[in-house]
UniProtKB/Swiss-Prot annotation:
Pfam families: bZIP_1 (PF00170). CDD domains: bZIP_HY5-like. The gene is bzpD. Keywords: Coiled coil, DNA-binding, Nucleus, Transcription, Transcription regulation. GO terms for cellular component: nucleus. This is Probable basic-leucine zipper transcription factor D. Residues 211-246 form a coiled coil. It comes from Dictyostelium discoideum.
Amino acid sequence: MDIDYENEISIVLEAKHNQHLNNNNNGCGNANNINNENNFLQDDLVYNFLSDEVTLGSDCTTPYTLNNNHIVNSNYIINNNNNNNNMLNDHSSSPMRVPNSSPSLYNNSIESPELVYHDNSNNNNNNNNNINVNDINVNDINSNSTNNNESNNNSSSEGELPCLVDIQQYQYQDMLPFDQQPVVVMQNPIITTTTTTTTTTATIEQQINPSEQQQQQQQQQQQQQQQQQQQQQQQQQHQHLLQEHQHVVNEEVLHMIDPSVDLTNTYMDAAGISDIIASDSSTTTSPSSPSTSNMFLTPMVTTTTTSETSSSSDSSVNIIPNNTNTITNILIKEEDTNNGNNNKKSKKRTIDSRVQNIVHPLTREELLKIAGKEPVQVVDPPTHNQEDERNVKKQRRLIKNRESAQLSRMRKKIYIEDLEKTISDLTQDNSSLKEEVLYLQGLVKQLAAQNSNSNNNSVIDINNNNVNNSQQQQQQHQQQQQLNNSNNNNNNNNNNSTNKQQQSKNVKAAGVCLLLIFFSLGVFFQPPQSSTQRFGAITSFDVKPTHSILSMSDSESSPQKSLRLSSNHHSLPDGTFNTIPIDQQTTATTNTKSLPSYVLNNNDDSDSDYENVNINNNNNNNNNNNNNNNNNNNNNNNNNNNNNNNNNNNNIKRKQHQQNPQSDSFQNRKKIKINLATENTEGDGPLVSKSSATTTTTTTTTTTTSTPKTPQISEDVSIDEIEEPMVHSSQQYIVCSDSPRIVSNNITQTTESLLNSNSTNPITIGLLLPAESLNLHNIVNNIGGGERSILEISCQVSNIRVWNPLSIDIDHQSSIVPASSSSSSASSIFTNHF
């Protein structure tokens, strides 16, 4: 069955218009007029029509009447429920809402109400239906009072709902920014009641005593007056703004409507649209007049029909009041009671009407851009202000500082963690090492007991080795003693002289002092010698130098300079030493040379540690010296014997040295013998020395000499054998030492000391001279010193020469002693250059 929608809409509009008229007539109309005027100023047309505040009468019933019949017989049950706060600021857009449009001050995307019509054929059969508290039961227009009375009588005490309206709880929210305005909020219902009767059980008695109504009206008026005073103050402030806003919105709406776009409803004709536009224009001219034209500001309604499968659901109409934060659903139930006859039956249809909410109107180009989904380019103008740059730099510094602080904290944290880890590792290692130490100590104690026996055995072995070594040393010593005994047997004549050498140092020191006196006298009183004269011209006997020891020629410029031994007549063989002869007759000159340590070279026997120079003076002096006595003959015989013994001893020593090499200190402990010969032949006798690594500066002085005897220089035995040497009284020794008044018998040490001597480190030379050679045997015998004396001199040696006396008669010797030149007849005279 088709429904006449135009008639039904007209009925609703007339009912709304009558509501406003009744509000103006009663005492509550003053406040409602103001609210109604505000509602007409809204930009949403449908919202202005259906969101007006509901004014309740004194009996809490709606005064809607049409042809003396009540349209709505139920009460508005208003409940300020806080649970509906989640519905605030719900800006959900409708299908016809303009995209990307922000809600205005009075328009927050509130959906348009829904008009739902129910078929009442099934309502009588349903006895237990849940009725919302905020639902409005709409009875049929032709229903009479009898049906209402029956429904009231059939309703139980539980179905009867008293007036729950509290005027103080009204919240007037016409103005969005002000929550203090008392406005009746139509919220969604929460409390539901079950009825045992049909839909007529939801109706409430409309008849209330007139006295009660008057009292309620007076109370409402008093409360409304207080509220009006507050509203007037707020509305006066914002009324001007609202009017301007509404005027601008209306103009934009007119410009945005394109006549080419079909905005008409399928159920509405062109006349309805024209009426809407006319009503919109009338609101802009006279918004506050409560005329009938303002009541017909109908919105553009589009209705859609849903499927009939939802026939069991109640048809409802959503009536949304003028509250931007809440949405209330008002269900209008329509019951057809035509005198108990269900003559009019209508199908259940749902009409979903949505209204386009115009909030922020856009131009055609903007709408096309939005429809095309083109991105909007926003240009941000660059700022070149110094303040902005400073702020940016400041922020960068702050960011860097924070980053650095964070990094430092992280590093510190990591460092601390590493330290803790190392500490834990070290403690673990320490504990493990302690355990190992204890274990090793136990092993040491165990092994100590086991090794005690082995140590004792090793000590015994060492003692046995020491005993064997001592035995070997004793055997060697016995061999040496045997050699000494053999030497003693061969040299019986020299026993007396060896015993005299073992005198104490004090006696030697006294003899040295005495000889020093005589030697100095002889040196100072010696006359100068010419190149053509000899000592024989001065004294009754001739004296001439025989050797110039440790001198070098001027022609040698190479770094390796060899030592030469010069004499007036004879030189050594080529195989013995590298020598360079010197002219026999030279003037007294001084030459300064450096003597290296390798001045002497032995080409024949380089591996031997002993240098043996045996000069055998076996020449007979019978042709030259006929006046020699028996003493000279005896001396020759003794010299020959000594030479033979020395050769034998040297051969034995070489063999022992090859078998048992001794230390360097033993090898260097040597001395030189100077043997006088009675022969008249002349020869050279070099002194041999082991020089050190250093050099000394020497000067050679030559004098005119006569033909002396050639001494025989031979190497003596070691120091161990020197203690009791078998030397003849005629033999002479050169003994030297590094420190004064200490006599040395080592020829190697003597030679090195001679070469290394300088002004800061002078050398001390001690001469062990026989008394007979100095003709002092009588004086020495008178003193009781023996046949020999010692001369000790501390000096820097630059040149050494050995003077050998000529063979003279004993008679002449006694007369020469007091002479000034008697010291020149000494067996060995050292001339020193200071």
